[in-house]
Amino acid sequence: MPQIRWGRVDRMLRPVHRWIWGDSERRVRKLLAFAEVEADGGRDILRASEVTPDPLLRRLYLAHAIDELRHADLFRERGAALLQARPARATPLSAGWLPAGDHGIDDLRVEDEPDESLLAFLHVAEKAAAGRFTIYRDVVQDDPSTRAVFEEILRDEVFHMNYTYTQLARVSPERYRQRVWRARASRLWKRYLRVAASLAGLIGTVMLTIQYFIVLPPFAWFAKRAERRESPGWTPIPRDRDRSPTSQY
């Protein structure tokens, strides 16, 4: 299998990846989330094999879809095994606001996309997945079984990355590089939107917490202080209030 190197950003985020995968419950959630992503991707690629007019791509898409569904089973089985073996304890802090790093189809409508666009997207997604799974494989040194799952899946991801690029160059020889860059830009934009939405939710939670525990208590204290100054019981109404009004003002 070709050696896949870490990127500069991934090297800087290595402690974050170790923190995420160092907790058994977070590890289980990540594996089960990967299983869902792989299964969704497999179904979409299977649909692509049904609608493509290219017989070679039909066979390759079908093999790709079978691989993705098998990956889903591997992730699901490993997650279930860790789930059964974990000790019972409180749920830790979720890392769901961090970028997931998975490689789903991102709600791509397979029926509406030509083979060139789908191949470009799959190439970019599989390349990103291969790099990210390499990171995950390297940070789970303490879990040989999970590491073996990533090793097995990585071999398929490298093949998927290579065949999609080769076929893209075949079906679109003049514009395949442009299509790859367009797919990469679209993927980065969608990731930015996901991160921005997650970050906005996190900031909103922090601001509401600050408002509840820091801003509101002084107002509650002043309200209680004003309440203590009020005399208990009914408040008498002056007699001049009983006279009939002479005008509406």
Residues of each region from the PLM?
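Juxtamembrane, membrane-proximal amphipathic segments and lipid-exposed surfaces
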Residues: 228-249
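Non-heme di-metal
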Residues: 1-231
